[in-house]
Amino acid sequence: MKKIFDVLNVIKQKLFVKKDKIHSEKYYRRIDFLNKYSLLFHAIIAMAIVFIVEIISRRSFISACKFVDAHTLAFMYNSFLVFVSFSLVYLFRRRAFARVIITGFWTILGIINGCVLSNRVTPFGYTDLKCIPELLAMNNTSYFTAQQATIVVVGLGAFALFLVALFIKGPKYTGKIRYAGVSVAFLALLFVAIPVTTNVAQNTNVVASYYSNIAQGYDDYGFVYSFSSTVVDRGMKKPEDYNKQNVEYVEQKVNSQKQTTTVDGKTGPNIICVLLESFCDPDEINFLKVNEDPIPTFHELEKNYSSGYLNVPVVGAGTANTEFEMLTGLSMQYFGTGEYPYKTILKQTDCESIASDLSKIGYATHVVHNNGGNFYSRTNAFSKMGFDTFTSKELMNITEYTPNGSWPTDDILVSETMKTFDATPDQSDFTYIITVGTHGDYPKEPVIENPTYTVSGVEDEGMKNAWTYYVNQLNEADRFIKELTDELSKRDEDTIVVMFGDHLPTMGLQNSDMKSGDIYKTKYITWNNMGLPKEDADLYAYQLLAKTTDTVGIHEGTIMNYHQTQMNSTDEASYQDGLDLLQYDILYGKRYCYNGTDLYPASDLVMGIDKVDITNVSDSSTGDTVYIYGHNFTNWSKVYINDSKVASTYLSAGVLAIKKEDISDGDEITVCQVGSSDTIFRKSENAYTYVDPAVEHDSESETDNQ
């Protein structure tokens, strides 16, 4: 033990104890030379950092070289941005320390992007930082493993220790820092030059101001510029022609063409919208061959009911953005690079959606999703969009998981959907279902023994295993579709269902791999029991529900009516300009289209359909455990004693257990459904007063809970 302490003491002395050292004249001449030509060295270091970051992002030295060759000016512009950041060192005496921090900053961002791209197609952007707390709170998923967490913590810890040592023992600039002089003026000039040079670079097509394909944009214009644009380019730009007169002109054009709604919340059909996570028809992939059709139900519905391609805004990840377009009718192309509106504008602004439109005519509106309620800030977003209820996994009694153990199976969503219908017997329902069963990561090692569906056309063994896993999970999704439509067929209620893939799976697919020629195209299918004619059409995600409601005689809402009347216009530019104008007006403008009022306020979202209650509490025979009995408990049910959470064990949907030492006679017990970050989604309908059998009570106190 003494030897260990001696070694640690030596390390401490070497790294963290400052000792005066007399340097040679040659050392000081070298330092003077570096200071004199520091701008040149900064330029060289900046280019080196950008090149290294591109190697990490592309995971290929050759690809990084091709980027420099094919997009030399973009590479130089990325280097300029890093060079400007290095100019900050002139404000400090510990310039070596400042240079290491700046170098570490860009390198760490590049490493994170490389890690992200190893698991999905969409590169790392600023908005992803807002998802980190939710990712860290999610256990047993491919988003963030314990191994990744350990590597991140150890790596950042080591870097922090190195910075401390450098701060203590590193060199310090001894010359005069002219804070109010030339240095500060030079720094100001450099930073002022950024928007000017950016504008020039965009106007000369050195870089782009908008990425129709964010993954391709990062490839073409570099990580540093692209990530920086996600930081500063958020929200919507105000259209040049935005004013009350132009908004009213668009509204008048729509009003002159729109039809009248012919149903209401009692006579209208139930509408179900199903997001099929990462769903892709294997027949659409040119190289992939499957031994037999894994999605026969999907293909049968595609053949007999309205269907088509669906243009979505993301590939490989970003479910929330496809969801946003589909529910609101608004387009992601007008937002900043890589932005998630759920994490930005919808944090403070309510937003018209299909839910609020249908609520106006008496529909009950629901969301059912077997993943965490807080992920993508969905609980907040669904409230802002006007939904009545949201049943997330915390409100479900989930027992079955996918073969890789990461995600709940989707079969539970059928019964949970039926609950939404049964809860409102006198109303028509709009229920939005979000599946997760086909979610990545797709294991590159064999996971399923003797899989029913096997693939060929894939040479790499790891990718062959991944595709095998994926197509077998597609079959599970297909079974879910059949179970859902079969169950709906049993009900004597008019119903229409629309199902769609939110994006292609994270499998590195390219445009050339797809029969459609576009990795931003998925498919949608429909089902109905109303005898509606088959009308195939290729749509954008933001047009899907406008088209669906149009077929059943529902013509409600500013945006939905806009699409219903204008989406078939031969003037595509005018159609997009009008959408841009209305979208800005609703989210960022003065809401001229609502006459300046808040027509669609946020709802008081109720989490779950089933009520949670406590029916009895009793001690175990051993006296060391207390059992809480009730209804509709889940794995996310937590016991609170006098409003403070205590450790509890889930035993069944009707029984929870706590330690006897955590409760005292007369304490008040409640059961809460708890999400990530200890968010309480729902409390038990009643509180229960604990009566300790070891304490004498009068008869009145013993009957308080009856």
PLM regions and their residue ranges:
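Serine-centered coil/turn micro-motif
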Residues: K14-L15, E25, G222, S353, ...
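Short alpha-helical interface patches
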Residues: R120, L129-N140, A149, Y225-R234, ...
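Alpha-helix initiation and N-capping motif
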Residues: L129-I132, D220-V224, V247, I295, ...
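Transmembrane and membrane-interface helices of multi-pass
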Residues: K2-G217, G666
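Membrane-interface segments at or immediately adjacent to transmembrane helices
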Residues: I194-C273
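Solvent-exposed soluble domains appended to multi-pass membrane proteins
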Residues: Q259-G265, C273-L276, D281-Q706
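Short, well-ordered coil↔helix boundary/capping segments
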Residues: R99-I102, Y126-L129, Y221-S226, T468-D478, ...
